[in-house]
Regions:
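Hydrophobic (often cysteine-bearing) scaffold residues that line and stabilize catalytic clefts
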Residues: 60, 64, 115, 119, ...
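Short, surface-exposed loop or secondary-structure junction motifs
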Residues: 155-365, 377
């Protein structure tokens, strides 16, 4: 087939099926590439393209943009994805800064960022949808003879048999940070378990069960647990006989028009199409790679095993996709992904930390944070109808405490958007944003 014929065929096909920012997953192109170029893709499945609503420049708000840009300059943030909803209408979506310092490529709305622990919201929504569909019960045991993950039979502490699915959702499984974060102990686990390579999720589970005791009775004490959310990913796989990533894509994201989100890789050469580059704060130490293959790496690239975090912190997304996700469980939206009971359970605990997936919930205000080296993500659903998501490709020295500064900045910035009435979720997009490839 001639090159021109192929291009015309592709354009006609995409034009026929493109509405808003949806794409198809029917066609795959393969070609060799270098690791750093957006225009040269190692592979392209349309499903991996992350199309996103893009505003006409006439709708830009100078005051809003100035607030964002001042913030990025103040904290030396290289790039950002920002989206704002009002009453479940996407009223603002824009990229700021650059994705790559070397090429100075501008950040656009379709670029993908690691969202770190904001991934837990995706996992919790998936679990609650499985409850609604009768696939799972929150009272089911995780371990033991009658547990979902019964194959892990050897355990140092029999109290592990008392851990239920609901305990994992609100970080009350009984583990403690006094033992460190199991998801970031690759070298220790490899040594103790006498593994040949870095531990995978199965190795980590076996390590915890065989070598660690619960510090609390399950269900009694909050202790933030990445390990608990990794287990939720394993539960999803066990119950569905699918990979965690594919099940979420097929049953939560794509049926609701959210295309392009994927699980992140660890190294720079594992970046997905349209994924940004990540930058640690100036003066940050270098580390030995999690797999022991490199003596010294920048922490965003190989310092931690992001991929194995999986359900606890490995998704990549843009800000428009995140607010779209929140709209699916917003109590004021006419469309509800979850039953009223499941949606309410996610935010109705006695303590604000009892929320499922959210970092916290007070009244009708819910928030979710995510922090890794080179990454910061903040999602806030406000009782006044505003929801916003901010994702950064740079980290600052204060780590997770930086999230409050993002909140303060955005709460000020959105005051400039009170009169925006557009809904970018239903605005047809320029074809170049749906099919940005060169053949």
């Amino acid at each position: 087939m001639k090159k021109s014929t192929l291009i015309i065929t592709i354009l006609l096909g995409v034009t026929a099926i493109s509405f808003a920012f949806y794409t198809t997953s029917e066609v795959v192109f393969t070609r060799y590439v270098d690791e750093d170029s957006k225009s040269q893709l190692s592979y392209l499945n349309f499903n991996l393209v992350s199309p996103a609503p893009e505003m006409d420049s006439s709708n830009y708000n100078d005051e809003f943009d100035a607030t964002i840009q001042k913030f990025l300059k103040r904290w030396d943030i290289k790039g950002a994805s920002v989206a704002v909803m009002k009453d479940n209408r996407l009223i603002y979506s824009k990229g700021y800064g650059v994705t790559n310092l070397e090429t100075q490529e501008p950040t656009e709305t379709h670029h993908l960022f690691r969202i770190a622990s904001a991934s837990k919201l995706i996992t919790a929504i998936t679990i609650m949808k499985m409850v609604d569909d009768g696939i799972l019960n929150l009272e089911e045991n995780v371990f033991g003879e009658d547990g979902i993950l019964s194959s892990y039979s050897e355990m140092k502490d029999p109290k592990h048999k008392k851990v239920k699915v609901k305990h994992l959702l609100n970080h009350k499984g009984g583990w403690s940070w006094r033992d460190g974060d199991f998801m970031f102990q690759a070298a220790k686990i490899k040594r103790i378990m006498k593994l040949e390579g870095p531990p995978n999720d199965d190795d980590i589970i076996e390590f915890v069960l065989k070598h660690r005791r619960l510090r609390y009775k399950p269900g009694t004490q909050y202790a933030y647990s990445n390990f608990g959310y990794m287990l939720l990913g394993k539960i999803i796989e066990k119950k569905t006989n699918e990979s965690y990533e594919q099940y979420v894509i097929d049953n939560i994201l794509e049926p609701n028009g959210i295309y392009g989100m994927r699980i992140s890789g660890n190294y720079k050469w594992e970046r997905r199409p349209f994924e940004v580059h990540y930058f640690n704060h100036p003066g940050a130490y270098q580390f030995q790679s999690f797999d022991g293959n490199y003596e010294s790496v920048e922490k965003p690239y190989g310092g931690s095993d992001i991929n194995t975090l999986g359900a606890a912190g490995a998704w990549i997304a843009n800000a428009s996709q995140l607010v779209k996700l929140v709209s699916l469980i917003d109590p004021n939206n006419s469309y509800q992904l979850l039953s009223e009971e499941s949606r309410a359970l996610m935010v109705s605990g006695k303590n604000y930390k009892d929320a499922f997936g959210w970092k916290g919930a007070r009244g009708e205000n819910y928030w979710r944070t995510g922090t890794l080296a080179g990454t910061a993500c903040f999602i806030y659903r406000k009782e006044n109808g505003f929801t916003y998501a901010v994702i950064l490709n740079s980290s600052v020295w204060m780590g997770h405490r930086f999230n409050k500064y993002i909140k303060w900045m955005m709460d000020k910035a959105i005051l400039n958007l009170e009169n925006h009435q557009q809904n970018l979720f239903y605005q047809n997009q320029n074809l170049k944003n749906i099919l940005p490839l060169e053949i």
